Amino acid sequence: MRTKQRNNLAETARHERVAQNTDVYAVKARNYKGLQRGSPVFCRNNWHIHHAKSGGGQILVCVAGRGYYQVEGKEAVEMKPGDCINIPAEVKHWHGAAPDEWFSHLAIEVPGENSSNEWLEPVSDEEYRKLK
């Protein structure tokens, strides 16, 4: 996935960390950085972890459509417009569109000390298709 701020125009991106194409807008405010992602049906990212010695993590805000986020070992949580999810650092998770609906969300990285992202395995089609 490429992320560039280009006069607020979206770039369509495809990357090994994301299933399906997605429109991405770069967002930056003070020490926070993030993406607004427009995700078509079946689009979701891989499992990943936002590492940080202190602080860090990620905030998800559903802008439109319907999507999911899931923490490893827990049930997936449906996201609808206005929903806000705070994911602490060191939590393995994924997020993306519902299997049958378009989804747009802000994914904001919370500033942290020695922060980094670790991209892991894809969410299997079998697991993903179980979502309704």
Q: Predicted segment positions?
A:
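A short, N-terminal "cap"/entry segment at the start of jelly-roll beta-barrel domains
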Residues: 1-36, 41, 46, 116-132
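Short strand-connecting beta-turns/loops that link adjacent beta-strands
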Residues: 31, 54, 74, 100-101, ...
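Short, conserved beta-strand element in jelly-roll/cupin
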Residues: 38-41, 52-69, 108-111
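A short hydrophobic beta-strand segment most commonly corresponding to one strand
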Residues: 59, 86, 100-119
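Short acidic-glycine-tyrosine-enriched beta hairpin
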Residues: 73-90
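Asparagine-centered strand-capping/turn motif at beta-strand->loop junctions
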Residues: 96-97
